[in-house]
Amino acid sequence: MAAAALGTSVLARLAWVLFLPNGMNFVDLHVYVDGSANFGSGHLFDYTDSSKTPDFPLPFTYPPFAALVFYPLHFLPFSVVAIGWLLATVAALCGVVWLALELMVGTAAMREPNWRTAALAWTAVGMWLEPVRSTFDYGQVNVFLVLLAMVAVRSGVWWISGTLVGVAAGIKLTPAVTGLYFAARKRWITAIWSAAVFFGTIGLTYLLTPGETNKYFRELLGDAHRIGPVGSSSNQSLRGVLSRFVGHDVVSGPLWIVAALVTAVLAFFAWRALASDDRLGTLIIVQLFGLMVSPISWSHHWIWLLPVILWLVYGPLRQAAGARVLAGYWLVVTLIGVPWVLGFFQDSIWTISRPGVLSWLGAVDAIGVLALYIWIIRSGRLRNGRPVDRSSEQQPIGRCNNCYDGVNRAPNIRGGRDIRLRGYDFRGPQPALASRELRSVIHPTRKFVL
């Protein structure tokens, strides 16, 4: 059933691409392919494409390293690149869902048919969330970058994790925020190596095309207006939300600074409220913070909302009051695509001022993030009842200091199902449930599979 749903979603998307008038839009993919063809010419950042967006000719806005990565694509027919990009994005989305579930339930559980079915089903659903829909429409790179971050978090090898994040940041600066995740997990060497790899991408392009590298990092970096209209409803960052409320670009002024500090404080305490082994929870707190404080966070940048929904449904706080409400909120907002709908009600993408109700509706993502942080702080503390142990995660895979015999295994009494005890996964026989109190902290993992 789940495989059929995913297949139907893929076929529907292909039909959308092939048969609808604007199906082969791929405006951003055109910029990647045609813009990168100028790599090394000295005119990379002079390129613009206005064929689909006459009100805003799209420039190449990524670092020169991204152009180097995309450069080989311009040798292929664009139709081949587009279809391949679409199918690769579906595969990457499936990888994102799979890794999100694996970070919560463990590698062994993902071998079970139930969890494989859940991964396929959520991939089928995820294809129709607005951030993913827009990623398909524009031919954006976001799903691939999210996948790189997820693989980096899953890996316990410092140089692999650091290389993946450093390369992702070299392609598009925003994944650099993943370094905060490594700091939160006390993976200091990984954080340092990711920064070194990122600067290595800059050094490489400086050797190949020093003029373009200098121009990007000395002149263009930080120019949000070159990326697009800050006040557009599609910009769901704090800067975009606040600008729409006050009617002008707040830039990085006092109002933005206060909002960013409040967000940072809430993100910090939300992280502190999580269980020490909740890697996915930590990751989404960090990534949502990055989306909030970035000058521009288009609605299609918010791919991370799919892992957020999965974490609310299957994560360690899934039974806390409000978890289903928040999951439902994000599902409704992303399936409808509220920022996308609001785009039809603005005079132009350059108009910042708008009626108050549209400003509030245009803040759905920012409001949702702040509500999520506050909910995590409350629910995490109620569940834990004591400060969370923030010891380093650098311990052998399969070890668990709070588990029987020091490993992820329940006592050998009787039964045979996987169980979950206070946030830990145990692979082994299920103990007899002798009391109602014990039942309240032990839950068969199978119970929570779609």
Go through the PLM ranges and name each one.
Residues 1-161, 185-302, 352-356, 362, ...:
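Primarily membrane-embedded glycan-assembly and transfer machineries that use lipid-linked glycans
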Residues 48-60, 169-175, 224-226, 243-253, ...:
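Juxtamembrane/interfacial segments around transmembrane helices
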Residues 95, 99, 147-158, 182, ...:
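Transmembrane alpha-helices and membrane-interface helical segments
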Residues 165-182, 294-304:
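Transmembrane helices and adjacent periplasmic/lumenal helix-loop junctions
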Residues 295, 303, 334-337, 437:
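Alpha-helical transmembrane segments and their cytosolic interface
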Residues 313-391, 398-401, 448-450:
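Aromatic-enriched
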Residues 393, 398, 402-403, 410-417, ...:
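Repetitive helical segments and hydrophobic/amphipathic motifs
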